[in-house]
UniProtKB/Swiss-Prot annotation:
This is UDP-N-acetylenolpyruvoylglucosamine reductase. GO terms for molecular function: flavin adenine dinucleotide binding; UDP-N-acetylmuramate dehydrogenase activity. Cell wall formation. Pathway: Cell wall biogenesis; peptidoglycan biosynthesis. InterPro entries: FAD-bd_PCMH-like_sf (IPR036318), FAD-bd_PCMH_sub2 (IPR016169), MurB (IPR003170), MurB_C (IPR011601), MurB_C_sf (IPR036635). It comes from Helicobacter hepaticus (strain ATCC 51449 / 3B1). Its EC number is 1.3.1.98. One of its GO terms (biological process) is regulation of cell shape. The keyword Cell cycle applies. Keywords: Cell cycle, Cell division, Cell shape, Cell wall biogenesis/degradation, Cytoplasm, FAD, Flavoprotein, NADP, Oxidoreductase, Peptidoglycan synthesis. The gene is murB. Belongs to the MurB family. It catalyses: UDP-N-acetyl-alpha-D-muramate + NADP(+) = UDP-N-acetyl-3-O-(1-carboxyvinyl)-alpha-D-glucosamine + NADPH + H(+). It is found in: Cytoplasm.
Length: 263
């Protein structure tokens, strides 16, 4: 596989990291090779915290940044961005992708974590998923809350094609997005535990706005891990560790990370 250098301090959404070698997946055979070498897929690094010492990283090449109308369904490559998916669905009056207005990332990452907002999740759009070069029905995978259960490299997906883009729903998601912090962020740091909210739990133990170095939990939304300027990987990891400890001691709830930590 070809490789190139990515500076995660510039590339990742939280702007933390260092220049690291990343392998390019250009074919299904490359995907299988990456798996055999235990490589981690970085996508657009929107929900990743990457150590300066991380190794065995890979990403989909631009060959997988495509979208095509196949008549009864839309096929989208794993490297295609959420913003472009949203724009296509809106301009072609297709329903279901309104929530992507507020979610950054690539198709592969969205499917991998079954991304969503409120009651809307990517699984509701999916017909089939191409994993390691093999198409499988969406029902083949668990597709749980923020975890698809997919083990492998997501090369593409097929979306149901339904008419009726909902402009009112888009407006709701735009309003939600306004409550998100403006600083570099990895998005939601922790998954919401059943029957509760991670942000509420973090706020209840005094961590809203709390900083270690330049890593902080946002004043706007406690579950957003942000970079106030020069945060390091160690700052962010220490803050996550502290948060899990405080919440567990106060409530007995073991918070599960939504951000993926690559060490």
């Amino acid at each position: 596989m070809q490789t190139h250098i990515i500076n995660f301090a510039k590339y990742s959404s939280i702007k933390i990291g260092a220049p690291l070698e990343v392998s390019l997946i250009q074919t299904p055979q490359d995907a299988i090779s990456a798996l055999s070498q235990n490589m981690r897929i970085i996508g657009k690094a929107n929900n990743l915290l990457v150590s300066p010492a991380a190794q065995k990283l890979a990403m989909l090449d631009k060959h997988f940044a495509y979208l095509k109308d196949c008549g009864n369904y839309i096929e989208i490559g794993g490297a295609y961005s959420s913003g472009r998916i949203f724009s296509y669905f809106k301009s072609h009056n297709l329903a279901g992708a309104e929530f992507l207005q507020a979610l950054p990332g690539s198709l592969g990452g969205l499917v991998k974590m079954n991304a969503g907002m409120k009651s809307y999740e990517i699984k509701q759009l999916l017909q089939a998923i191409n994993v390691n070069g093999k198409w499988q029905d969406r029902e083949s995978f668990p597709m749980n809350y923020r975890d698809s259960g997919i083990e492998g490299v997501i090369l593409a997906a097929r979306f149901h094609k339904r008419e009726g883009f909902n402009n009112a729903l888009q407006a709701d998601f735009i309003a939600l997005r306004k409550n998100h912090p403006k600083e570099p962020s990895c998005g939601s740091c922790f998954k919401n535990p059943k029957g509760d909210f991670a942000g509420r739990l973090l706020e209840s133990v005094g961590l809203k706005g709390y900083c270690i170095g330049d890593a902080a939990f946002s004043e706007k939304h406690a579950n957003f891990l942000i970079n106030k300027g020069k945060a390091t990987f160690e700052d962010a990891l220490s803050l996550i560790t502290l948060a899990k400890k405080r919440v567990f001691e106060a409530s007995g709830i073991d918070l599960e990370c939504e951000v993926q930590i690559l060490q």
